[in-house]
């Protein structure tokens, strides 16, 4: 009810704050017998870990995961899996100047109006720090999906600010800090980010996520559509302001003769629907695009108010990502995997498939 759990049969409950002792999650509903060790999860966490390049927050967190329960002798037991990640490099003093004011574009104001109290340290519960447990849970989902169905979930950045990144090769994605699928564009991205940091400003990005290998039939009609659940999950990622599948908003300019993929004995002739029709998977790749807004914590002074409603000028200190999108790719992959494993289990429960 309080919005901290994702999923129906494969449930992930996320807990913690940016500057608390630890963050983590409880994964409930994981099938028993899945080989699992901390290294399986750590590999994914290392992909989103802060402080790995000059273009992301310089907060130094090892993000070492601890498996507290649900695994015995290297396999899952079917009971809840507790995952813990300790916070080791919080600097709460950096936020003393915004304890009583609200950052423009940040959740500060909305949290205060909802709860009547807020934790200003690193954004508290609204911090992107809370995506680490999501990635940890997603690592479990990815491994199960790959083992059971051969499903592969991966993503990349297709645009950073005004710079479009033409797709060249999946092989280029892990070789740079941006998850860019085109190594030739990386120097331009680096130069842009260096100038952005000097300006004390931030920028948005576009992320693409693709799931391949899943069968047709996953998803429920009407209100539990597969695409609806994907959009719901993706909007839970900090700074996401838009989600589309397949051709997305480009569908507006398409005619039905173009958008509706013809079906042949060999399969579909196109995939403008992004792998989902009627809320149910078609067996084609699931393709998702995310629009991520610029980070709201910047050094540029902006107008705001304090808790008394008085006008103030706000400048955010501390260590922040000038572009949340740079580390968003592994998070978006995790969220897509979590939705897919949930629907895979629901399909098995209802239809036996």
Swiss-Prot record:
Q: Name one GO molecular function term.
A: chorismate synthase activity
* Cofactor(s) this protein requires: FMNH2
> PROSITE patterns, from UniProt?
CHORISMATE_SYNTHASE_1, CHORISMATE_SYNTHASE_2, CHORISMATE_SYNTHASE_3
Residue intervals passing through the bilayer? none
What PANTHER family would the database entry show? Answer: CHORISMATE SYNTHASE
Q: What does the protein in this record do?
A: This reaction introduces a second double bond into the aromatic ring system.
Please identify the protein, giving its name as recorded. Answer: Chorismate synthase
The top of its lineage is:
Bacteria, Pseudomonadati, Pseudomonadota, Betaproteobacteria, Burkholderiales
Coding gene?
Answer: aroC
